[in-house]
């Protein structure tokens, strides 16, 4: 990596950590979207592993409901691992230009869902039936694009968790997705010691950005910030989808 690229990555992780500090999520989504503009997605995903793992473990252990969350979600988490390891083959084998298209589609689908915010509530019976399916699909999307949010986020929001439980449930899903993605990349020879050290260096700007985001969260209009963030993801997704047409 040359010096301008180091600086760009440093700023990306500050921005991604800042978004997570303000909203409680978004670090992998922002980081993958922006890193994907300057490097292959497999490299971007490898760079993301440690800062994503550290910040999501922080979120996972931030409340008192870990045992409750684990009891409800262990089966979904198991299928996230399976889907991610399988899907990661696509991330390392598809040409970077077309992998970027997949990431762009994932960003737009997530932003569209979050902008519309349809109200969904799932019964206990459907939860038992669909949790493995949602885990498998989330894992496959994670493995193929490096983005953890679809359909895990809307699914977890539909399960009627309390506020603190939902924060920990999201932390659990993102933590498992991060570990599974690292395992998938390693199995496909796309995660090496050099990338581990670079990923470790990214912890500092990510935590700095997260701290800044938490500091200013109470001072900014969260609704307006969220709208601008989702519109930004949509524009970024459209740009990634358009690349093959402009190549």
What do the PLM-derived regions correspond to, one by one?
Residues 38-42, 63-70, 157-165, 188-192:
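Juxtamembrane helix-boundary/capping and inter-helix hinge elements in multi-pass membrane proteins
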Residues 5-6, 36-53, 97-107, 136-146, ...:
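Structural signature of hydrophobic alpha-helical transmembrane segments
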Residues 5-9, 72, 76, 100, ...:
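Residue-level signature of transmembrane alpha-helical entry/exit and packing/kink sites
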Residues 44, 86-90, 140-147, 181-184, ...:
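Hydrophobic alpha-helical transmembrane segments in multi-pass integral membrane proteins
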Residues 56-67, 88, 102-127, 214-215, ...:
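Transmembrane helix exit motif
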Residues 47-96, 179-223:
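Selective hydrophobic functional segments
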Residues 11, 15, 50-57, 74, ...:
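Hydrophobic residues within alpha-helical transmembrane segments
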Residues 1-38, 120-170, 177:
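Selected transmembrane alpha-helices and immediately adjacent juxtamembrane segments
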């Amino acid at each position: 990596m040359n010096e301008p690229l180091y600086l760009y990555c440093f700023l990306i992780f500050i921005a991604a950590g800042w978004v997570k500090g303000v909203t409680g999520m978004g670090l992998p989504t922002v980081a993958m979207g922006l890193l994907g503009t300057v490097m292959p997605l497999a490299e971007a995903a490898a760079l993301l592993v440690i800062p994503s793992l550290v910040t999501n473990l922080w979120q996972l252990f931030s409340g008192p409901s870990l045992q409750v969350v684990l009891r409800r979600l262990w089966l979904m988490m198991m299928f996230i691992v399976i889907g991610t390891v399988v899907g990661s083959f696509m991330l390392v084998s598809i040409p970077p230009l077309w992998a970027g298209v997949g990431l762009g589609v994932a960003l737009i689908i997530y932003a569209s869902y979050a902008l519309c915010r349809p109200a969904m509530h799932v019964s206990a019976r459907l939860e038992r039936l669909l949790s493995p399916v949602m885990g498998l699909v989330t894992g496959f999307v994670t493995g193929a694009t490096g983005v953890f949010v679809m359909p895990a986020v809307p699914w977890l929001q539909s399960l009627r968790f309390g506020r603190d439980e939902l924060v920990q449930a999201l932390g659990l899903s993102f933590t498992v997705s991060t570990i599974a993605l690292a395992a998938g990349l390693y199995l496909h020879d796309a995660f090496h010691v050099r990338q581990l050290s670079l990923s470790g260096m990214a912890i500092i700007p990510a935590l700095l950005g997260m701290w800044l985001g938490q500091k200013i969260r109470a001072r900014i209009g969260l609704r307006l910030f969220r709208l601008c963030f989702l519109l930004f993801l949509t524009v970024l997704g459209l740009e990634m989808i358009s690349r093959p047409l402009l190549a």
